[in-house]
Structure formats: structure tokens, C-alpha cells
Amino acid sequence: MEHSHKLLKQVIAAGFALGLAHGALANEDKITKGYNSMDAMGCMLVRECTNDVEEVYSLLDISSQYDNTEEFTPIAHEFNAMLLEMNRIGIKVYLADQRYFPIMHRGVYHTVTNNVYLNKKYMDEPHVLMQLMRHEGWHAAQDCMAGTINNSMIAIIKPEEDVPMIWRVMAERTYPASAVPWEAEAQWAGRTQNMTQDALESCARGTMWTDYDPTPMTGEWLRENGYID
């Protein structure tokens, strides 16, 4: 699909960038190219590597992993609300060991298996966790905008001109040019309270295309594929 169509076929919607230390465990025989590689992440994403990859059922499953558990209290309501909507849609969230993530990755949403994976090494700061959960949750909502989460397509939700310039510039400095439209609005959502929550609720209700006007090219694609009249 061409970039101008504002639909992106991809296997991975990558998360925030940050330097990553290396880990090791001897029993991941499915991984042939070492830890902290795309190969290692792929093994996790398709659920062939599950050691130290734990499903998150509430914020406490994450906050209890760290000494500063009480510092997570202010984000509990929004986090748990997003998690609930993700689960309603069919998306699971996992907290995973750093060895499964390539260098510069804090988290990932997988558009094929529809799961979110959070890098345990960096989730000890509540604001980082919340930004990442919103960011990857927005990618899930983009998946929904493209017709259904049961495909490997994502579509932008907001008109590009509505995205504040600061987030577009940040995306341009961080991601390949072809990914900027999707990542710019995900950066925006990552730092905006309830923006992702609202989109996930819309997806769960089945009102995505009435709550948010599809872009012209997305609308054309949705009509061609029978999602809207």
C-alpha cells in the first residue's frame, strides 16, 4: 500500500527508543541470532519464547515488580481502563524480559497476534510506563481503524494536520520517513491523558468510523473491503 494511502502493512509497530543492556538465558533454542535482536523479539511475538514473558492483568502485576510500587498509584485508573478495553478488543499485554527486545526498544505492539509487549527493564518509572501503554495502545487503535485488529494493517486516525508539530518533529527524528504519520500521532497520544483510552473504547464499541472520520484514502479502502457503506 502506498504511503499516500495512510495505510501501512507491517508486522511490528515499534515502541519508544532507548538504549538497552544485554541479558542472557540459555534455554531459548528458537533464537538463532542472539538476544536483543529482531530474531529474539520475533520469537517472543509469535509466542514461541515465553520464559519471563508474563501476562498483565492489572497495573499491580507491573508495579509489584519494583521497589517503588506506591509511585504507580496515580496512573492506576487510566492504565487499568486501557487494559480493560484492550482485553475487550482481544489484545493482551505482557511484561517481558529485556533480552527479547532489540537495542533501542522499550515496547512493541504486534499487529498479527495483537499483543502488546513491555520491556521490564524500563517499566519501573510510572510516567514511562504510561507513555508506552498509551503509545502502543494507539497503534492498536490504528489497527482497528484499518478495518479490524485481525489483519496486519494500521491506519492513521487523526488528520495529519491536526497532529501538533512537536510530535511530528520528534517522530521524524526517531523513525523512518515511511512510518512518521503513524508514529507522530502515537507520540501525541502517548503524552495525552485519555486520548488512547477514548480510541480503544470506540474500537470496542464498534463505532471507530463514526467517532473518528477516516481519511479519504482510508475511507476508500474501508468501502472497497466492505467495512463501511
Located regions from the model:
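Bacterial N-terminal signal peptides that target proteins for export
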Residues: E2-I12
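Bacterial N-terminal signal peptides
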Residues: V11-G19
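Cleavable N-terminal signal peptides
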Residues: A13-A14, A24, L132
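Cleaved targeting-peptide boundary
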Residues: L25-Y35
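Auxiliary, metal-adjacent structural segments of Zn-dependent hydrolase domains
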Residues: N27-E28, D39, C43-V112
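Short pre-active-site segment immediately N-terminal to the catalytic Zn-binding motif
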Residues: V116-M133
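Catalytic Zn2+-binding segment of zinc metalloproteases
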Residues: G137-I154
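Metalloprotease/metallohydrolase-associated module, dominated by Zn2+-dependent proteases
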Residues: N151-D229
